[in-house]
Regions:
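Divalent-metal (Mg2+/Mn2+/Ca2+)-assisted nucleotide/phosphate chemistry catalytic cores
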Residues: 1-115
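Conserved nucleotide- and phosphate/pyrophosphate-binding catalytic cores
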Residues: 80-279
């Protein structure tokens, strides 16, 4: 749990001297989030410096590869800049990470169910792993599609159609055999939709079956853990303690490189002792 690892806050503080305000303002992800959250008039400092905090989250554990969506690539690049700057100014302590992005283009920037922005908890346009089967179905059936596709006979558009974006991300060939045997593959389904004669409801029901299948083993496992909440906290506690040990080691190396590990620098203490001996 991030908030239980204070070493991350200290690393963030040290990294702040390596980044300018102008550089943060140029971060495309930050600019986009500022507009989306209506922060133009008054930007919270904590939000503005989030890329630096994220750099601490990554470098504290010396991650070499970070799986991200397309919108987070600027954050990874900012982290890489911080690492290079620190290693250049002080010592080769930090590991420069690389981004790992999906080869499935639809997964790079999965929109929210409203089709207006990326899926985000704060925007309330998410499908949660904890959602019930009924909640998931309700959300999928309310998904944004093509506003001009009013009648089944109308030709539909795929661009900006959230349902088809999700199908691009999650649909597999075997899903047609199980849930929609009238079609051989997604291309056939898309072709039918674009020429007209295929309704949104049928497509949404197909997507619902796919997402429900994806989430069912997660729900099952969650229900088992819900029976023993103390064990859940025990797992979280152990994981946090293990993470804190790693972060503490990185922080120690960072402070040593910066020459601010005053009470642990045996060589410094020895040198000072020799310097003032006999005075």
């Amino acid at each position: 749990i991030q908030s239980q690892i204070p070493e991350l806050c200290e690393l963030t503080f040290y990294y702040m001297d390596l980044v300018t305000v102008a550089r943060l303002q140029r971060n495309p992800t930050v600019k986009s989030e500022i507009q989306m959250r209506n922060f133009e008039a008054s930007i919270p400092v904590g939000f503005f410096t989030y890329p630096i905090s994220q750099a601490a989250d990554i470098t504290a554990f010396k991650a070499t590869t970070v799986p991200v969506g397309e919108d987070q690539l600027p954050m990874i690049e900012q982290t890489r800049e911080i690492v290079r700057k620190f290693n250049s100014v002080y010592d080769e302590v930090l590991v420069e990470p690389s981004a790992l992005i999906s080869t499935n283009q639809a997964c790079l920037r999965l929109p929210g169910i409203d089709g207006k922005a990326k899926m985000s908890k704060s925007l309330g346009n998410c499908i949660y792993l904890s959602d019930s089967e009924a909640d998931v179905k309700k959300k999928i059936m309310s998904m944004y599609t093509d506003p001009e596709h009013l009648l089944i006979s109308d030709p539909g558009h795929l661009e900006g159609n959230t349902v088809f974006t999700y199908l691009d991300a999650f649909c597999k060939p075997e899903h047609f055999e199980r849930y929609l045997p009238d079609y051989a593959n997604l291309d056939e389904l898309k072709a039918h939709y674009t020429r007209g004669g295929l309704g949104d409801v049928k497509v949404k029901k197909f997507l619902n079956n796919i997402i429900q299948e994806e989430l069912e083993p997660i729900r099952k496992r969650r229900k088992e853990y819900e029976k023993d909440i103390p064990e859940v906290y025990n797992i979280l506690r152990k994981g946090t303690e293990a993470a804190r040990e790693v972060a503490a080691q990185t922080l120690s190396e960072v402070k040593s490189a910066m020459k601010i590990n005053y009470f642990d620098d045996v060589e410094l203490i020895k040198a000072q002792s020799e310097k003032y001996k006999g005075i």
